[in-house]
Amino acid sequence: MNPRLQDSYDEFDRQRRVDEPAKSAVLPGTGTEHRTDFARDRARVLHCAALRRLADKTQVVGPREGDTPRTRLTHSLEVAQIGRGMAVGLGCDPDLVDLAGLAHDIGHPPYGHNGERALNEIAKAFGGFEGNAQNFRILTRLEPKVLDATGRSAGLNLTRAALDAVTKYPWQRGDRTKFGFYGDDMAAARWVRDGAPAERPCLEAQVMDWADDVAYSVHDVEDGVVSGRIDLRVLADDDAAASLARLGAEAFPTLAPDDLLAAAERLSQMPVVSQVGKYDGTLGASVALKRMTSELVGRFANAAITETRSVAGGGALHRFDTELAVPTLVRAEVAVLKMLALQFIMSDHGHLGIQADQRTRIHEVALILWGQAPSSLDPLFAPEFVAAEDDGARLRVVIDQIASYTEGRLERVHEARSPRPLD
């Protein structure tokens, strides 16, 4: 690693909440650790079970739909790669931003944002459910790796800077729908955020967040084109572009409709977009589509690097040195792509019907687990349920178990324990 980057972070950034014993299985004379602390953090995330489970969790369409599905896992790998490249350009530690990309959706339940909605409905009286807060809970508590002095799980025991890099919303719920910490995780949250500016995410988290926006805006559209749901020629249609601009202005109040209209026009006139045309799955069409996704990702990532450098200057940037700056015209282009996916994929009537069934399934599994707990819970969760002091804490354990499920397991639990109609 570049020594300049390592020197940008101090012992406070590299501190772990729990001191760990020396490794005992090393061969004599081979105990030297050659990795940086942040490289070790990345390895812990890469090898954890919660990350692997994302392979069977929905990104936009289900992980079993089509031959080349995008899942929460493949999306996280893409976010990590985009973020890592941006980190190199900005002088952040690449391993930090990479692991933040890997872990940014690690708390997502079955069925992605739709499952998040269902669990939030179930837990609304006891702190709600939010995927970002669940990320933090998994990394600091639920994923088994390190025990503290009392024998309780400290999760992966990542460094302070690593946990902060995953934290997009460094605050509790309050009256906001997006938040990063549940109430009973605040001891760990206060440790991570010690000395940090109030409610300001660190630069590494901002880079991860923009890499996430870039990845899902471009790749969700790519998937929509391949599936036949999206025809990019609509960007050149005045009425369709106006509709996208209206949707975008409602979803992103900081962007003016005129900015979004102009963004749709710019996108439609880019050769890499217009050359895709009506996608038909041929070699030429597939190459054109892949060229488009590659060039758009590069456009959006490099614009943020250049704009940030124009404000903050040269040198290695990290933590709270500066804010990530993204040009308005690029934010507008990303917003238009998001609206394409929203209008032609996520608002499809068939898709909405599937989502309603998914939420019902989650509600029914929650009732099953709650009614039969603790025997219905996994060995990792049952002791926490027994030790819980009130219904809110007990429900949180049930929520934790459901959030950990893959979609396949959730459906198996539902099928096995649901009453069957008589023939």
Curated annotation (Swiss-Prot):
Family from the record: Belongs to the dGTPase family. Type 2 subfamily.
Location of the HD domain: 72-217
Protein name: Deoxyguanosinetriphosphate triphosphohydrolase-like protein
A Pfam family assignment: HD_assoc
Biased composition (Basic and acidic residues): 11-22
One record GO biological process: dGTP catabolic process
Family annotation (PANTHER family): DEOXYGUANOSINETRIPHOSPHATE TRIPHOSPHOHYDROLASE, DEOXYNUCLEOSIDE TRIPHOSPHATE TRIPHOSPHOHYDROLASE
InterPro entries in alphabetical order: dGTPase, dGTPase-like, dNTPase_2, HD/PDEase_dom, HD_domain, PHydrolase_assoc_dom
Record's keyword terms, sorted: Hydrolase
HAMAP family, sorted: dGTPase_type2 (MF_01212)
Chain segments carrying region Disordered: 1-35
Keyword Hydrolase among UniProt keywords: yes
GO molecular function: dGTPase activity
NCBIfam families: dGTP_triPase (TIGR01353), PRK03007.1 (NF002829)
